[in-house]
Regions:
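Short phosphate-binding/catalytic loops that engage adenosine nucleotides
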Residues: 39, 143, 190, 201
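Metal-dependent DNA phosphodiester-chemistry modules and their immediately adjacent helices/loops
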Residues: 196-197, 207-223
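Short, aromatic/basic amphipathic alpha-helical patches
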Residues: 180-190
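Short, acidic/turn-prone active-site loops that include or flank metal/cofactor-
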Residues: 149-154, 173-176, 197-200
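A structural-propensity feature for long, helix-poor, extended segments
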Residues: 165-179
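Phosphate-handling DNA/RNA-contact segment within nucleic-acid enzymes
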Residues: 53-166, 181-182
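TOPRIM metal-binding catalytic domain and adjacent DNA-binding surface shared by DnaG-type primases
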Residues: 1-68, 72-74, 117-123, 188, ...
Length: 223
């Protein structure tokens, strides 16, 4: 089960995995930041989040002081394996005024589904979020969730990964881009339903209304 994940070759996979293990040793540096976003330490460790503390591997120099978000993929006959990572700026500033996006993706990466390891176990339903941290919050409270790296990142061939699910719930942001994402996914996935959010995205909803707010949003499409 693979999408456009990079890299494929063994040497580069091992390099990324070694880097992730290094960055994960600095997790304590960002626990307060993650907690402020609703992510528990247990969840952070489960997803192997890390931080680049002035020790980037070659090629990661531009991501110093970023949160590292490993992309883990299921492997037949073994545990899920880290194959790539994205980065999130951890500095308390307006990223736009500093001429860089909040989330950074290595050059040449065409985009991948986050947390495909969640799809390794047979289930009747799956939840799709707009953003990695949103999917972590849903998983934190018992919903199997994956994420797209942006509202416009859907790729047609991903459809095959979701064919076995009876129910798919789309948690896109409540804005025009999020609405377009929901429409795109509902066209591609007939069994998909859009979960309406009003407060903000999944993280905003959770921070303001807790799990109850998320449950109430989901209940509106389950009734």
């Amino acid at each position: 089960m693979y999408d456009s994940i990079r890299p494929y070759n063994t040497a580069e996979r091992r390099r990324i995995q070694k880097a992730s293990a290094l960055y994960e040793t600095h997790l304590e540096n960002i626990l307060d930041l993650l907690s402020a976003r609703g992510i528990s330490e247990e969840t952070a460790r489960y997803h192997h989040l890390g931080y680049i503390d002035n020790d980037p591997i070659p090629g990661h120099e531009d991501y110093n002081q970023c949160i590292t978000i490993p992309y883990m993929y299921p492997v037949w006959g073994g545990p899920a394996e880290i194959r790539k990572m994205r980065f999130r700026c951890s500095l308390q500033h307006d990223c736009k005024t500093h001429n860089h996006p909040k989330y950074l993706t290595p050059a040449g990466d065409t985009g991948s589904i986050y947390n495909m390891a969640a799809m390794a176990n047979p289930a009747a339903e799956i939840h799709i979020c707009e953003g990695e941290f949103d999917s972590m919050i849903l998983e934190q409270y018992g919903w199997s969730a994956v994420a797209l790296p942006g509202a416009t990142s859907w790729q047609t061939f991903w459809t095959k990964f979701f064919e076995g699910y009876d129910h798919i719930y789309i948690w896109s942001d409540p804005d025009p881009a999020g609405d377009k994402m929901a429409q795109t996914l509902q066209t591609a996935l007939p069994q998909a339903t859009h979960v309406p959010l009003t407060i903000g995205d999944v993280t905003d909803t959770y921070l303001q209304a807790g799990k109850t707010g998320l449950t109430q949003a989901l209940d509106t499409v389950l009734q």
